[in-house]
Amino acid sequence: MELDVFVGNTTVLDEDIYQLWLDGHSVSDVVRQRMDAGVLLECEASPDVLQSDTIDQFRTFQMCERLLQSPSKVANQLLFQIPSDQQAMLIERYYEFDSVFAREVLGKKLSKGTKKDLDDVSAKTGIALKSCRRQFDNFKRVFKVVEELKGPLVENIQRHFLLSDDLARDYATIVFFANSRFETGKRKLQYLSFQDFAFCAGQLISYWTVGAVDNMIEDMDVDLEKDFLHDLKDLKVLVNDKDLLDQHKSLVCGQLRGKIKVFNEMEASFKNLSRALVNIASKLTHAKDVRDLFIDLVEKFIEPCRSDKWTSGDLRLFLTHYSTSVHTLEAFRHQVIWDRYMGVIKSCILKMYHD
């Protein structure tokens, strides 16, 4: 007599319980939530069975956690039989983070000191302390791994942590801000969300870093290109040379007359606004001024426009003509640097210009 025997030991994972575990809930919390959701009736199970099942799930997740901290090990381990699509789900969800949590630690040093403050972050955001710690440790882990790598930041994060493109880009923001230590905590910047900063980080990484110029560069592309920052000083001529400043103003006013409601306010404040943008550029050779980029944009450009009741449409038209009209100034010789600077600044200001 021949007998074929098939043994299956696929690990059964409940995605809903996994999410609750990630969110920092206790076993008793999860049991209560499952009972409230009618699981006992649905499965015709007793509370003891439900408790036992929840404990088993938690134990499985805790055993998986060590593997999830080095995602490439998940596919090669033999302890759990987990289908590849579920492996991807486990990794992605483990590394997902709450944007309100990320906003609180953005730009801070990923150190023990910051980790000690997570009690306050938890109280402020309503996110469980356990979840805050997991998210913070993930930020720190990704930063430490990619800090030593050469080449494109987003690709390095994807390759080593097997994350989706969107999530890898969000982590690139965390790494970029931790590396450059941009000021994000001042009161005047509190209206800006993590998504606002993530957009700006993407612009800076794409156009101002060493990797933006040469993706075979030895360094990681989170470092702003020093030669570019040094060359920004040449833009000062645009506001220091009275003839150039007057010509620039005349060109922009000629283009915008009758097209924006705040024309008179724009005409009156043109020189101050232009000086603000050019002075921000010329000071970026200093580490402190790089850190203050966002607060400078808010205080020296966004707030004056806001107080004069500019709409987003007014601002977009102004920045477009302000940027492009420079190309017709024959005495101005720094068009390439200007375009590289203003392309990013325009995008960031438009993203940051909201209540």
UniProtKB/Swiss-Prot annotation:
It is found in: Nucleus; Endomembrane system. Keywords: Membrane, Nucleus. GO terms for cellular component: endomembrane system; membrane; nucleus. GO terms for biological process: cilium assembly; convergent extension; determination of left/right symmetry; Kupffer's vesicle development. Its main location: nucleus. One of its GO terms (molecular function) is fibroblast growth factor binding. Disruption phenotype: Morpholino knockdown of the protein causes severe deficits in laterality. Partial loss of Kupffer's vesicle cilia with the length of the remaining cilia reduced. Double morpholino knockdown of IER2 and FIBPB causes an almost complete loss of Kupffer's vesicle cilia. Interacts with IER2. Mediates with IER2 FGF-signaling in Kupffer's vesicle ciliogenesis and in the establishment of laterality in the embryo. May be involved in mitogenic function of FGF1. This is Acidic fibroblast growth factor intracellular-binding protein B.
